[in-house]
Regions:
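Generic alpha-helix signal with a bias toward terminal, lower-confidence helices
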Residues: 59-61, 114, 124-128, 143-146, ...
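Intrinsically disordered, low-complexity regions enriched in small/polar residues
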Residues: 10-11, 38, 86, 118, ...
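Long, acidic, intrinsically disordered low-complexity segments
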Residues: 22-34, 119-152
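Non-catalytic nucleic-acid substrate-recognition regions in nucleic-acid-modifying enzymes
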Residues: 138-203
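A short, conserved, highly charged catalytic patch centered on acidic carboxylates
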Residues: 1-98, 102-121
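Detector for Asparagine
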Residues: 5, 19, 61-63, 79, ...
Length: 203
């Protein structure tokens, strides 16, 4: 978290609304807190950490439905993280939470698994190596691409370039009546012109 410039708080956080929403995993009615809480952009971040990798998660089925009984929520990282995230969703005005189940003590074998939680449900996401994608500068992009499944900015730009290149190629062939050996020269001239600060199609 420190390496990703995400300011975090052990167990409680400065936002009183979130603190009041925390409910014990043991169902005692008392307060309970995850290992860490943080804010990144519009997202609340919840982190539950377990020393043993085998305590990462307990699923109901192959669809990665997390068991939410007291035993599972108490023992397993992902289950516990989801418990606290749901408490925030249900009891505060914050409606976008990313809960992390983490396990392991060896940096080479540590498991970090994000879960996106909203009022409509939750989505267990692919494992990540660190928290860089969840910094204030990157988290919106992660949400758009990984949670929502939208295309990346680079892919959209590449498709736009390829579409325009095809259109230009067709125009040079159909209207410019240029052969294959002549078209690269025209394209090169256009690119050189575009690099000039004073270039304008109106001149």
């Amino acid at each position: 978290l420190d390496a990703s410039n995400i300011k975090h708080y052990a167990e409680s956080c400065p936002i009183e609304e979130i603190n009041k929403a925390m409910v014990s995993k043991r169902g005692t009615g008392k307060k309970g807190f995850p290992e860490y809480l943080a804010m990144s952009g519009d997202f609340v971040i919840v982190i539950e950490d377990k020393a043993k990798i085998e305590d990462q998660a307990k699923y109901l089925n192959d669809n990665e439905t997390l068991l939410m009984d007291t035993s599972s929520v108490t023992k397993y990282a992902e289950n516990g993280a989801l418990h606290y995230a749901l408490s925030i969703i249900q009891n505060t005005n914050f409606k976008k939470v990313i809960a992390f189940g983490c396990s392991g003590t060896d940096e080479k074998r540590i498991v970090i698994r994000p879960i996106y939680v909203s009022p409509t449900g939750y989505k267990v996401l692919p494992k990540v190596k660190d928290f860089n994608q969840f910094s204030a500068n990157n988290i919106d992009r992660y949400y758009n691409e990984v949670v929502c499944g939208n295309e990346s900015i680079e892919r959209v730009e590449l498709k736009t370039i390829l579409d325009r290149a095809k259109s230009l190629n067709d125009d040079l062939r159909n209207y410019g009546q240029l052969g294959d050996s002549e078209k690269p020269l025209v394209v090169s001239a256009i690119l050189l012109a575009l690099e000039e600060k004073d270039f304008s199609t109106e001149n």
